[in-house]
Amino acid sequence: MKNTNVIRSAYDALAESYNRWIDHKPHNAYYDRPNTLKLLDDVGGKSILDAGCGPGKYAEILMSKGASVTGFDFSPEMIKHAKERNKNKGTFFVHDFSTPLTMIADQSFDFVLCALALHYVEDWNDTLREFHRVLKDQGQLIISIEHPFFEYTYFKSTDYFKIEAVKCTWKGFGFPVEINSYRRSLHECIKPLTENGFYIDKLVEPKPVRAFEALDPKHYKELNEFPAFLCIRAVRK
């Protein structure tokens, strides 16, 4: 990732408040997680790689359902919180998406989960090839990303088809933090999957669950009219 250090610094700065808010922050707790988790089949007894695990909330949920979880994130502070949250359960380590997962053997996992993280990677191809390598035959890759149509509108882009470095300021974690990521077209979300050994099994334009409304009625209404995220289940060929 060209912006790795910038993104890492932002998430290191956010880590404490992000971890504190993640259980009930509406876009995470009542929009992303319920819709993304629906794409995972029964995880009891299964092995899951949580790629871009943040403070380990997904890992906490999945391990409570009987899964074995290994998580990585490029933010050392996020990994510290993931370990603290999950105590002695699971395995967590610092790793950059843009480098190979040399510490993981071929066909090690039943699932790879990558929730709201791939949009920090400019070129998905190497990352998806690694996900394909570490998945078992017919293993599933579950991803959630910012919806390309939402991003195109939000960032007021002029060339929809361009993979474009973008940035915005997050203000929902107690203090403003500039977040850098990459916007891309729907085609550029699907093509790297189908060209790197996956087929698309399910694609969801999610709506928030009802608990979102009491906490943020404005965005609840907006998200029921136009999606901000996109959830995809892809299967290893």
Where do the PLM segments sit?
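Short alpha-helix
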Residues: I179-V204
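A short SAM/SAH-binding and catalytic strip from SAM-dependent methyltransferases
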Residues: F111-W124
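A short glycine-rich, Lys/Arg-flanked "PGG" loop and its adjoining helix->strand segment in the class I
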Residues: N125-Q140
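Conserved class I S-adenosyl-L-methionine
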Residues: M1-G44, K57, I61, M78-H81, L141-T169, ...
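A short acidic, Gly/Pro-enriched loop at the edge of an enzyme's catalytic core
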Residues: T102-V112
